[in-house]
């Protein structure tokens, strides 16, 4: 799935690139790669506690000791396992009810969908960064993979 692709891409990022800054955004490559896994963490925490999904949790920075691509990928593997366990546990549940978020109420289904496409966009960005770093990757998420999602063909925000 998406998180598996993310982990495989993150593992390939050279550690000496993690401090580089993203185009048109004051965010390091390290922070972006952590963030793409923090998005489902925030969703899962909301699911587990019933508390409001906050912006602060969504953009929480990586721990200071998470300084290698391998460490970020390990975090990603843990998130993937937690997400898969949640998906198994909630299979067949009603997702039409409202859940509390920092941007107002939305349905559980819409929040899950938003979590998936938000992470997907950042995975596309990591793929682009790997290309900039001249790292070969077998498969990137392309335009054909995102059809039907509320994403543009643009990978980066414009200045």
Where are these regions (language model features)?
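Catalytic cores of extracellular degradative/oxidative enzymes
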Residues: 64, 85-99
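Active-site-adjacent scaffolding segments
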Residues: 1-11
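Amphipathic terminal alpha-helices
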Residues: 83-86, 147
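A short, structured beta-strand-centered segment in the mid-to-C-terminal lobe
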Residues: 64-79
């Amino acid at each position: 799935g998406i998180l598996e692709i993310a982990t495989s891409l993150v593992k390939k990022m050279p550690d000496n690139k993690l401090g580089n800054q993203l185009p048109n955004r004051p965010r390091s490559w390290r922070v972006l790669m952590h963030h793409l896994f923090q998005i489902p963490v925030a969703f899962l925490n909301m699911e587990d506690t019933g508390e409001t999904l906050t912006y602060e949790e969504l953009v929480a920075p990586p721990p200071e000791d998470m300084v290698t691509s391998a460490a970020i990928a390990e975090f990603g593997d843990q998130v993937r396992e937690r997400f898969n366990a949640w998906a198994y546990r909630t299979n067949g549940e009603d997702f039409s009810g409202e859940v509390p978020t920092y941007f107002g109420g939305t349905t559980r289904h819409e929040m899950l969908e938003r979590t998936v496409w938000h992470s997907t966009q950042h995975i596309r960005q990591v793929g682009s960064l790997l290309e900039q770093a001249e790292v070969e990757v077998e498969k990137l998420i392309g335009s054909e993979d995102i059809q039907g999602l509320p994403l543009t063909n643009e990978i980066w925000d414009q200045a």
